Structures are given as structure tokens and as C-alpha cells.
Amino acid sequence: MSSRRKRAPPMKVDEERQQQLHWNMHEDLRSEPLTMTVGEQACSDADSSSDCIIIDEGPPESALHRDKKRRSETVSVLEATEEETRLSVTLNVTVSPYRVDNSWKAFLGDFALQLLPKESLVEHFSERTFTLSPSESSSQFLIYVHSECKNVEKQENVLEGSAGVCSKGIRVESSFSSDMLQDLAWLQKRRGIKLYQRPDGTHTIKVGIYILEAGLTRLDFMSDAGSRMKKFNQLMKRVMEKLHNFIIPDVLEEEEEGSESEPEGQDIDELYHFVKQTHQQETRSVQVDVQHPALIPVLRPYQREAVNWMLQQEQFRSAPPADNSLHFLWREIVTPDGLKLYYNPYTGCIIRDFPHAGPQLLGGILADEMGLGKTVEVLALILTHTRQDVKQDALTLPEGKVVNYFIPTHCPREKVKNREIQDTEYEPKEKVHCPPTRVMILTAVKEMNGKKGVSILSIYKYVSSIFRYDVQRNRGLLKRMLKCLIFEGLVKQIKGHGFSGTFTLGKNYKEDVFDKTKKQAVGSPRKIEKELRKSVNKDADSEYLPSNTSDDDEPYYYYCKAGKSRSKLKKPALLTKKGKGQSVHLDSQGDAPAAGVCASTDVHVSENTCVSEDKQTQEAKDCAESPNPAAEELAQSNTSSPCETSDYRFECICGEFDQIGHKPRVQCLKCHLWQHAKCVNYEEKNLKVKPFYCPHCLVAMEPVSTRATLIISPSSICHQWVDEINRHVRSSSLRVLVYQGVKKHGFLQPHFLAEQDIVIITYDVLRSELNYVNIPHSNSEDGRRLRNQKRYMAIPSPLVAVEWWRICLDEAQMVECPTVKAAEMAQRLSGINRWCISGTPVQRGLEDLFGLVVFLGIEPYCVKHWWIRLLYHPYCKKNPQHLYSFIAKIMWRSAKKDVIDQIQIPPQTEEMHWLHFSPVERHFYHRQHEVCCQDAIVKLRKISDWALKLSSLDRRTVSSILYPLLRLRQACCHPQAVRGEFLPLQKSTMTMEELLTSLQKKCGTECEEAHRQLVCALNGLAGIHIIKGEYALAAELYREVLRSSEEHKGKLKTDSLQRLHATHNLMELLGAKHPGIPPTLRDGRLEEEAKQLREHYMSKCNTEVAEAQQALQPVQQSIRELQRKIHSNSPWWLNVIHRAMEFSVDEELVQRVRNEISSNYKQQTDKLSMSEKFRDCRGLQFLLTTQMEELHKFQKLVREAVKKLEKPPSREVIESATVCHLRPARLPLNCCVFCKADELFTEYESKLFFNTVKGQTAIFEEMIEDEEGLVDDRVPTTTRGLWAVSETERSMKAILSFARSHRFDVEYVDEGSVSMDLFEAWKKEYKLLHEYWMTLRNRVSAVDELAMATERLRVRHPKEPKPNPPVHHIIEPHEVEQNRIKLVNDKAVATSQLQKKLGQLLYLTNLEKSQDKTSGGINPEPCPICARQLGKQWAVLTCGHCFCNECTSIIIEQYSVGSHRSSIKCAICRQTTSHKEVSYVFTSEKANQEDDIPVKGSHSTKVEAVVRTLMKIQLRDPGAKALVFSTWQDVLDIISKALTDNNMEFTQISRIKTFQENLSAFKYDPHINILLLPLHTGSNGLTIIEATHVLLVEPILNPAHELQAIGRVHRIGQTKPTIVHRFLIKATIEERMQAMLKTAERSHTSSSGKHSEASVLTVAGLADLFTKENEELE
């Protein structure tokens, strides 16, 4: 059941609401509404305004006939299709006379009903309602006139067959067809329109069609597609087409949004060519000289054209258009009655309000090809077109307002800055002035007074923290003053004796304070000060008297009660000094301090009731005009502090508390919240110039206008923008800020951002800023929905508080998906001009442009519905004109080929490096290919249509079916790059020798697995033969098992339990002396072998038991030593609790324990926390006593239970464990000694640890309900969970911490420390004790496993009950033959697999020998057929025998066998090997090596080729720089280690933090000539013209990424020829991929260059990649 509670009892719905909640399931199929019951009346009162048209079921008939007809029509409606429904359902329309009422309606048009000859109308026809029904003739209709009725509402709901309807119909002809009338009826039923009579001639009846207010559409915005049901809009479109001749030009019928299919081959170049032609033909409205004086480079002609077009897009030097144009989607219609309505012909929506056109596009897409200088074009635009109409309203201080700013007065102003920076540094203890001790004690007692009073420790703490009084030094003084106050009756003791009790205010407190307050109110300032000085001197206390000139002056604090009003005085009233005289301003109500207003402090002060308002004003003026600086400073320092007012609220973004620190504070002008000025980046010099608003108020206000341009770029090229600006723009021309987010800068004031010319931000920062948008204000309702008040204010993003002049998305293809966080945040920014800058705006397809259009905010195409319907859907239907024309308006594109004569870039060439695998790599690749091919085909078969492109599938499916391809591509680079195959790369890079060793180990493991399967099948077959009485055959199979294990003894490990099974059962067969079993020499040693196998198996368990016991003893010894250190009779924590109660600090202790338990505590829903079980020290004492007793109890029980299990297990223990949990019938019974001990462990664990995981009992209780039986017959090893600190231990720690902080007896603290050490020792003991229990349990389990290992297959006895659940070794008599056939098949498969794997192992072993460098890679063994030396090339069959390549080719060509002649037989052992399983060894690969350039280290073929190529580049052209691109970072790490081995200096870009540093080192350091770049981050936007070589380690499926990578060097500024190097492995998936990409490029050059792998590949193409390569391998 849901945990949500009902908020209110159920209530009965009124009748009107009930009618609204009724509906008909088939109403969309029918043309008439539901008929009403016959019992309803026909008419009543005449003043209704309900619907004026109803639909009846037909002419008047008898009730019986009508009921039968209704039932038959209902059946026909249910069975009819949508087309049949329109023809079969009877049309009935009721038209009412027109009456003026208060409801809104508009006349759309009318249709005519023409009377036939010999037909006439009844009297007063125009005032009566009639029903229009069809007649026998399809072109004629019948009118049934209703009787007169006073109530229009009842008249309109009149029913067929009622007495109020005429029985004779009047024949008419309609100007509307029957279909159109049905549409009107459906619309009327939905309360969208009404039909009324209109006056006309006697032979013609005019019926007016009126649209009602309910028929109008409510839109959220003008481009909204509408939320009304689709059928309503379709019918309205038909009506408007009929009445107003609205026909949608050049737009196809709307279809489902997902129905369009992507066109075959999107020609992106065709779009770019159209854009280019359009711009060449248009005339420029703006032609200016864009060569700004501050711009250093001279713009090329194509760049000038681009900047001029951008200026035109931003309406440079042109007046903005009037904002009164009609929206593109809407048409204005004037109804016959003169009303103006607006109609959307695309949706059928009608509205009343004028649909204003959306804001005109300012900006666009700058899509110049990579390397043509888009950055310079943007800088020229920024310099040329600056904002002129910047509104400074939000940046200027409102007239009559001041910014409240103050520095806490207890901090000297000259030390504020130092303390802001170094609050924690040691400083000399400054002199602190405090009020009299009398005042401090009374304040403490009053403020902290509770039900039980205030203890003296609480008074000490309050005085120390609030007044900064040295309590340690003056404790005796405070005690003496407290005695005096008790004697005077100002304080009384309500509990305890002496100073250990609690205190509260006495009965004389009010009268005393009232008298003093009265005297002060009427006295002069000097007299008051004099009295206060006397009062101070009377106390035996440190005197408090402020100096006249010091900045350290503290104001006098005095507490007063005005009259008998019990108003709380939470803050002390303030005595301030002004000029030469002193004046006291005391608030008579005691609510807040009052003081004169000083203009120099800019602080609001409460109204003063003791001094007149005029006097305050005059004093403030005197203070402001005072010529003496010292007096001004004195007045400022002594003005009432804002923190002493009742409405003072402090909440800063730094998280510091109000009382901490001495930083200056500033108040928001809007929400009046105080914050640290430095934290919100507000400077004191701006007090009289700029207003201050807190971050939340700034974000909620109108954005601040600015001239700044916001540039959003990838992290990799953020610093490149700064470099480009510094290089291309003259110094001091632009102010540039690199914004790194609120995490780095805090909240920057919008006026600071507005002062910049360019603000640069990365997409990563923009993405993170989304988390700081829409944060609720601390003052709002959403901001206070927390149990405790927030410690700090969440910082909103200042980016949304600025109206940017220009927003530029660099490499805008990163936000083409409008759902990504960066795109979502970019859309939230407010800007005038919006620009998308990208050299490849289209990567997957033309649908990518939609994300850019959404950012630009171009209506209506920024709505997905209109983008698809008006642009993309026609494009898919071979009508690209609409899309091309729209894109041409917003995009500028220059291609390199069009401006090649202007940029003068040297040519770029390409080199292909075809490589061949080494034998070890080839073997590894074949293994991977076999697994990946099977995996891929299995996944692809789940997809029915193989013609689908991968881009049409969901992301998860694409990732799944591309995973096998990914593994093969990685295997071509380096075996260690394949995830999950080897250890992580952080350990070390694997050499080829290590790869060979790893492959040998894997192959050995596979051989052992195949051998285990073979032995299992042989043992099973032997059991079947014993069942059938074939004892000789059974004995032979058991002997075959023993022979096989001996035969492979040096190569493979045979399972000892399988050998024991064969030995034991063979010994039993021989002991039974069955006839026909021949003896062998080994029979006499079977018993001894069986004994050795058992002892060897048990020795491992016995060793584990001894080791666990040995590990446990030191911990138990340390526990005994710790227990000896605890001497007291009562527990130390109990003594601490008692002392806390004696000193009346028990409440503090309880609170500290609760806080300790609650911190980092995740409470379970069904469990009560310990902190909720006690309220005072008595409850805490009871809980701890109970829990410690339970802990010691279960600790003792667990130790005793384990002690009992130490002795060797008896037969009874083994049998009980077997029945209980080792081999239970269904569920574990938990009845043996081990299970009972485990339950004790579970209980002990719950006491010792804080464990939230279910124990064993709960787990098995849940498994009882499992119908399929026991899921796992093993007992869980432990309870399995979180070993966190228990609540008992945390309580003890809190008590110990309390005792230390209050300096209780050292004895208690020492015992507490020992107790905590004891807890740690107990936890160690528990873990070791549980491991010891596990080893003891495993020892019993091993004994049972030995017993189970000797059991063989047998038939269930006739009277033996059928086991439930079934047992594997007991079978039914009819299952014997089935098991025999299965085991025979298993034996054949295992034998074949074992031979294959042994052959591979032999092949790898021979390969290891052939790679011995001492032999030069030559195999000296002769070929078994021709006797020639095998040399450097030979073939290995699956059996492991080797032949020369010539003999192998002859065997394959002439002696192939099997189906399709696809196998050969070994010339030595005659074992069959398929052609594809023949392994070829090549110890000398000439294609991969160049003898003149040796490479150090053992690397993969491709890594070695990359390193050799880099070395060759350096030899041919010293100082030439090269970029190395790879899709995977792991491959780059492997290459980096290979470069290190060969002493080649390089740098690598793998982390954003070191990106700029490493890139600069590559560019400017002459010794670093190699840069390793990951493709996904290093290929976008970077300018690295210093490099001339680009190395692509693997073929790239996304050619757009490839173009980006190549474009890093082939761009403006490049002065040298560039070379692209590609590395491909022959006869692998890479060769197939390269051929596929070349084919796609030739068939459609441009479009294939912009697609991702998901767009390039189809399902069939992916399958073809695997199948074709499989054929090549064969």
C-alpha cells in the first residue's frame, strides 16, 4: 500500500461535476451524443443559456421500437469501422432560435435549408426549435418542429418520441453536405460551436454557425501546437475551409511526427551550395569597412563578406522593425458580424487576441569550414558593433536610498582586511571591554532561562561566548557577584545547593530595572553616564569605560524593562556618544535598540521613542556635517549596530555564523538580508554609487543590460580564445574575463560582468551552472522547508542576471541535442544577439540543425512540431526548398575550395601504413573474433529489419550491438586495450612475451575445463553401465579416467574429487568380483590412492583451521590485558552521568549523545533510533546498562559456541549438518550446532556493530515463499553488511568526549579510553572469531563433499519415496537411456574440445620456442612429410603437429574431407582439423619492419609502427611536430610508454587541468615534437599549425571527427605541407571498415563525411563486417 496519507475525507461530488465526469467510450466513433432517458422532461423555465443544438436518434417512434433500435445501433457502432460509421449512423441536428445572452460567441458563417415545393413552415417557426434529420433521399432532409416551450434549456434537450415534437417532417434541401453537418454536430457536442436560426425569406431557412468561447484555443505561446484533441482541430479546419476558403498552400497533410523516414543520403554539400548561391544573389543592406583599428590581422575578402553579413543579421545601423506584425502561422479573419478573430490554418486553432510575431532573429550560424579564421571574424564583429542603448537603471543607486554597510564594532577597522584573509592566524590578544559583571550575569540568566533554570556552567559559557569575558581568570569574581544578586533578590536559586544548583530571575528584578530605567529616561546624558560609572565602580569587577578617541570603543550595554509590559529585551539597549556630549537613546518598549542616524555609517536605525524625531534628524545632520574626522569616526563606531535590531537577519554564502569573524557586512536593498561584502564581491567604494542586491534578488530581477559578449567554448580551446584575443587585438582594447563558475568565483556582481567586453566560459562550467539556477530564495516559502535553518545560502548563477549583448556558442555542434545540460543552460541565458559558430554544424544529419535553431530561438521552428512539419517532413518527401531557404537566412558558409586562392594553404597528402599481425597477436585476434562474431550475430538476430540504420535505434541498443565491433577494433591496436581481458593499464603495459605467457595460461585453463567435462562424462557413463549390469564396461571407463589423468599429469590438473570418484567406485567393482573384469597391475594400489586423495583434500581444511585459531589468540590476549586495566566497580560512563547530573549539565550531555548518534545516521523505516528512546540522563543510563548487558551476554554465548566446535567433528555432528544446511531437503532447518552458532553471531553482531542488512533467519524466511524451491543451498557466510560503529559505542565516545571537555576526574577519562580500545579489540575478535567458525564449518563441509564425491548414478528403488526437490544422482528407470545418450554426446564434445585446446597449447609452446632470439626465429625441426626444415614459416593443426606451408597447402587442395571439403586430417594422428582452425606461424614479418630503424621494447604491431613512423619523421625532418590521435585513452597510454622506452620526448592531453600547460609546451618547446590527443576532446576547435604530421592510429567511424582532427593543422596560418598517416592491419576488421568508408565516400562524398558511426552503418552492414571477415579468415 502507498504510504501517502489521505489529506481529507471523501466527499460527494455535486451533480454538475458528475455530469462532467461521465463519458462514452465510443464517442469518437459516433456522430451523435448519448441519448437521454425518456423520463426527462422536455421543457421548463425560459431563461437558460445552454447548448442550442442537440442530436436526436431519429423521428418519433414508439418506446419499444426506439429501445430495440438503440440496441441495434449500439451493436453496429461497436462493429463498424471508422468509414462505415459515418455512413451508418443517423444524422440528427437540432437548431434553436437566436436569443441574445451574456455569453461570448462569434458568427462564422451560415448555411441554407431550402423548402421543397408544397412544403410550408408552421406558425412562429423562427421562435421555435427544430430537429434536422435525413430522409430516404440522400440529398433531402426532414425538419421536425418542437412544440412551444418556455424553458429554452429543456426545449433544447427535448427527446425523440416525446409529446413536444411534431410527428410530421418538413422536407428541405441543405447547402451543406451530410458529412459537413456531421462535423458540425460533433463540434457542437464538444461545446465548440452553436447553431442558431437567422432571419430570412419564407422558403429559405438560414442556420448560423457561431463559435463559442469554449471553441477558442488557449495557447501558452503563439507557436504552441495546441493541446486540444486532434479531431476537433481537423473538423474546425474543414469548417473554416468551407466558410472562408482557407487552403494551406504547399504543405502536405499532417502526419504523425514519428512517421517520416530519413531520406537516403542527405547531401549536405547541396545545402551548403544553396546557402552560398543565396548569399551571392542577395544585396547587402549593410556594407561597412570592418577593418577595425584595434584588429591586428588584415581581413581577407571572404572574411569581410562574412562580417558584413553578421552585421546585417544584427541590424547594424538599421532601425528595429515595429513589433506589430502578425505571426507567421496565423491569419486574420473578420466575421460577418464584424468581430476580428485569428485563425491558424495549420492546426485549426482560433483565438481572439492579436498574435504578435516573435522577436526577429538577431544572430545566426557562422559555419565557415575549419581553418578559415572564424575566431578573427567574431572578434571583428565584436569590435565593430558595440551596444549603444545600455540601460543603467539596475546599475545606479535609486534616489533616496543608501546601501547599508557596517563593520562589527568589536573589530578595529584597520585590522578588518587582515582578519578576512587570515581569520585562523594567531594574533595578539586584544583588549576587550565588557559590561559590569552584574549586567552580564543578569543577561545570561534572563536569556538562557528555561523550565529548570540556568546552571552556573551555562552562565560561564554565555558570558564567555557573548561578552568575550575571561571566565577562567575571573571565575571567583563571577561567583561573588552571583551571591550578591541572590542576596539582593535579583536572582533566586530554584534547585540544588551552592553553585551546583540552577538559578532564575528573582522577584526584585522587575522593580530594580524599572526604577533605573525611569531615572535614565529623564536624566541628562552626562548624569546617566556618571551613574553608570558609579555602578561599575561599586562592583568588584573589571571597569568598562569607553575611550573618547579609540576605534575600539564598545557601546554601553544596559538592560531595562519599561513599565510592567512583559516585552522581551533580546538585545541590549545602546548608549552612544555624539560630538562633545553624550546622549542615551533607550527604546522604552525594549524591543530594539535606538540611536541617532549617522549619515556616514549608512545604517538603518530603529525609531526612538525617548528623543523626538526632529532632534534625531538634527543630530544626524550634525554628525554628517562634523568637520572633525575623529568625531566622525567616533560617531560611526558608536552608532547602533544593525545586529542588535530585532529584524536583523544574516545568512551568507560562505556558511559562517553571524557571531564569527569581523568581516564587513552589507544589506540587500530588496529583501534586507545581511551578507559579507567580500563574499558577494561588493566593494565599499561603491556604497554611494552602485546598489547592492543579494544574489537571489538579482537573479529574480530584470537582467542587467551590458555590452559584454559571452563566448561559450569547449574546455580544450577556452585558453585558445584568450591567446587569439591577445594576438589579434591591440592591447587595452578589450576587457576579457574567463569565468569559471560560482564554485571558483563565488557570486560575481552583474555590474562587474557588465563592465567586461568579453566573458569566456566553457561548456563544462555552463553545464555545472545549471545546478545553480532556480534556487529558492532564503526568504521564500521554498527556501525554508527544512527541519533546521540552513547554515549557508546556496549561490545562484549570475549568468542569468545579465542581458548579454551577444552570446556565441563556439563549436556549437556540442549543443545540437537540445536536451543536454549545456544546451538547456544556454537557452536560459538572456541575450540580444545569438550566434552559433561551428565548422561542422551537421554531423549525424540535417536534424542536428534543430538544436541550433532552438538556441537561436527562431519561431516557429524552435518548436519540434513545426520544425518537423514545415521543414523536415517536406525535406524527407523530396521537397527541400523550405528547409534550404530557411537555413540560408540564418547561416553563412565558406568552404576551403571556394576561397583556396585567398588563404594560400599548402597541400595536404596522405600515407597508408598496411601492417601484418605477429603470430601471437594473430592468435589473440582470432580468439577475440570468434567470441565477438558469435556475440554480434546473436544480438543482430533480435532485430527483424536489417535495413534499419543504427541511428534509428535507441542508444542502449546501438551501444550493445557495437560492443563486439569495439572489442575487435581495440584488439587491432593492442591486446591490453580490450577491456576485461587483462589487468588495467595502470599496472604496466604488457609486452608481447607477456601476452604469449598470458595466452598460454588461458589456454591451459581451457584445457583443464575441457578435461573436467570429459572426466565427468566418463564417470557418468560408468554409472549408467553399472545400472545396466555392464560391469566390465564400467570398470574400463573408470580406468580410462585414471589413465587420462596420468597421461596429462604434466600438462593439466585433474580434479581430485573426480579422481577419487573413479578410484573408489572401481575399487568397489573389483571388490564385488563381478565376472568379466580383467585385472591390472594397478588394482592393488587403489585403496592407498583413495586414502591419499582423502588426506590431501582434508589437509587444506585442517591447515586453514589451525591458521585461523593461531590468528585469534593474540587478539584474545590483548582483550584480557585491557580488561585488567579497568579497576572500578561501577562502569566509568555511569560515573560520568552521575557527575553531570550533580553539576546540572545533564541536558548538555544528553544533547551531545543525541547529536553523536544522529550524525551521519541513515534511519531505517522500521527501526527506532537509540536517540529517540531516551530524553534525559536516567533514560540514557538505563539504555546503556541494558545494551552492555546484552552485549556481554551474547559475547559469552558466541565464545562458548565456538569453543564447542573446536574438537574433531563426530559422526552425529556431520550428519546433523548434512541434513540441516549442507544437503537439506528443501530449506535449511537451522538445527545443527553450526547454524545455531551463526544465529548467535548474528545477534552478537547486531549488538557490536550498527548493521542494516538482514540476517540469515530473515533471508531464509523470505525464501520459504519461493515456489521454485531453494535458490541457493549455501548458508550466507556472514550477515553481510555494513560494519559501522554501533550506537552504543558512539554513545560511549560522546560521553568520553564530554568528560574530557568538562575536565572530569582523570580516572574516568582513562577508563573510558581503555573501554574504547576494548571495543576495537572486541570488533577485531568478532571478525577473527567468525573466520574461525567458517573454517570449522568448512572442515565439516569438506568431509561431506568427500562422501558425496563417491556417490554415483543410481535408479530410485521401488519403495523409495521420490525426492523433492529432485536429486541429481538418483534417476528414474525410464531416464537411464536418456542420460546415456546425453553423456555420450558430452563425451564427444569434450574430447573434441580437449584436442583443439591441447593443439592450441602446443602451438603456443612451439611459438615460444621459435621466438627464442638465440635461434634467430628459425624452427630447426623437420617437416614430418617432406623432411625439410620448418624454418621461419610453418602451419600448426589443432592436434599440435607442425607441417611446412607447402605440404599444408597440398593437403588442403588435394586431400580435404568432410562437407564442402572444409577439413583436413593430420598426416600423423589422423585427427580432423577444419581449414579455419589451421594456425600459421610467421617468425619474420618483413612488411612491418624497417631494419634501419629499430624500436626498443616489445610492443604490438601497431604501436611499434606508430613509434617507428615518429622516429622516421624526426630523422627526415628534425624539429617537425606530429599529432597522434586515437579514440581510446588506453591506446594513447600504451603509445606514451613505448615513446618513453625509446627516449622520445612528448606531451599528452588527458586531463583538463593540464590541458593548456601541455599544449603550450608542445607549441613552444623545441624539444617536444609529439602530442598525444584523444579524438573526442582534442579534435574540436584547436589551432595547432605548428604541427605538420597527423597520425590516426585506427580508422575512425565518424568522419566528422576525422575531419576535425585533420583540420587542426590544415588551416589558416599553416606554411608547410601537411601529411596524414593512417595505420591499418591487414585481414582484420580494420580493412573491412576502411573499404566500407571508402565506398560510402565515393557514393556520397559529403554526406558520408558528416555522419557518425550510427548513421553510416546499417544492421545488415554491421553483420556484413563480421561475416565477410569470417570468410577472409577461412
Curated annotation (Swiss-Prot):
One BP term from GO: nucleosome assembly
Self-association and partners: Homodimer. Interacts with HLTF, PCNA, UBE2N and RAD18.
Top-rank taxon: Eukaryota
Function: E3 ubiquitin-protein ligase involved in DNA repair. Upon genotoxic stress, accepts ubiquitin from the UBE2N-UBE2V2 E2 complex and transfers it to 'Lys-164' of PCNA which had been monoubiquitinated by UBE2A/B-RAD18, promoting the formation of non-canonical poly-ubiquitin chains linked through 'Lys-63'.
Enzyme Commission number(s): 2.3.2.27, 3.6.4.-
Protein name per UniProt: E3 ubiquitin-protein ligase SHPRH
Gene: Shprh
Reactions listed under catalytic activity: S-ubiquitinyl-[E2 ubiquitin-conjugating enzyme]-L-cysteine + [acceptor protein]-L-lysine = [E2 ubiquitin-conjugating enzyme]-L-cysteine + N(6)-ubiquitinyl-[acceptor protein]-L-lysine
Zinc finger (RING-type): 1423-1470
ZnF bounds (PHD-type): 649-700
Pathway: Protein modification; protein ubiquitination
